[in-house]
Amino acid sequence: MTDTIAATKDELLNQAAREYRAFHEALQGLNEEHMTEVWLGTWSIKDIVAHISGWHREMGPALERLARGEKPIPAGVSYDDVDAWNARFAAERREEPVADVLLEFDKSHEYFMHAAAAVPVDRLQPGKTAWKLVDNNSAHHYREHSEQIRAWRRSRSV
């Protein structure tokens, strides 16, 4: 989509919405076989979608805590091993039908964006924790993976 850097809360949320739509466009026309074919390391597109949903569900509460003026991450929780979290999120949905994983993606996006919208403007500024949480788990994440999916589709003429 675009690499335009958002400067306000509204721009950030709008950018997330645009990249979400672009991510869905990258999936358009793919069938069950395409969605479950492993091609990104050990992952399929279904796994990509599942792990994004996992981050939504994991980081939504962090945004809710920030909106209440609390620390975003509970004591004792670490996200240093992102790959382990990614693997966990993908594995949690591996046995679910593609349609259910896609539905959960839509629901988790809606939940995450609702949590992001509730963060006060003064806490949702470029460079602040809330800003990074929103961008990294929405626009940036959608763009990263939609680009990978589009490249895979081009390589396969899909």
Which residue stretches match the model-derived regions?
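Acidic/histidine-rich alpha-helical segments that form the ligand environment
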Residues: D81-D122
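Basic/polar N-terminal segments that are highly enriched at the extreme N-terminus
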Residues: M1-A7, S157-V158
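Short, contiguous alpha-helical
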Residues: H34-A84, A118-V158
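Positions in alpha-helical segments
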Residues: A7, E11, W43, D47, ...
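Hydrophobic packing residues in well-ordered alpha-helices of helical domains and bundles
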Residues: K9, L13-A16, Y20, V98-F105, ...
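Alpha-helical bundle segments that constitute or directly flank the non-heme di-iron/ferroxidase center
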Residues: I5-E32, G54, E58-R65
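Amphipathic, well-ordered alpha-helical segments in soluble domains
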Residues: E19-A26, W55, S108-Y111, A115, ...
